[in-house]
């Protein structure tokens, strides 16, 4: 019962935390405020009904959830040529720590190396443009496009509201 309760609490927090954020304090405590008055109109029952629908439950029966380092995961599932992978890794910024686990530049290098040199599947990545990230993926056979994104939320001015992103593919 406890894992089910944890799943339910996680679902609730993701849906009702401010701007869908999920972060922890340096002490390991969840520290995102409630979403505010606009969230009062969110219909939790409607969302729960969708998650109980036959179509989605059928899909979930074929779904496996992993909690692994990305490289362990990819080496476990061994994506093939007819697979497609969408990647949304943490940004190359000072604020890239989730649940007290940093995603470092070494992790960014490992990810780029695996995706460019070992991954047989087609893949697409969206990530904030930095010189470091651009340099990792500016390789033959890799396509890089840019697009601008304006965020509504920027906590304590840690993140720029206007950001250029990279859309990176191997096809």
Please give the residue ranges for each predicted region.
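SAM-dependent nucleic-acid methyltransferase catalytic core
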Residues: 1-86, 90-96
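Long, positively charged, glycine-interspersed low-complexity recognition regions
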Residues: 92, 104-171
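Short glycine-enriched, charge-decorated loop/helix-capping segments at active-site entrances
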Residues: 98-102
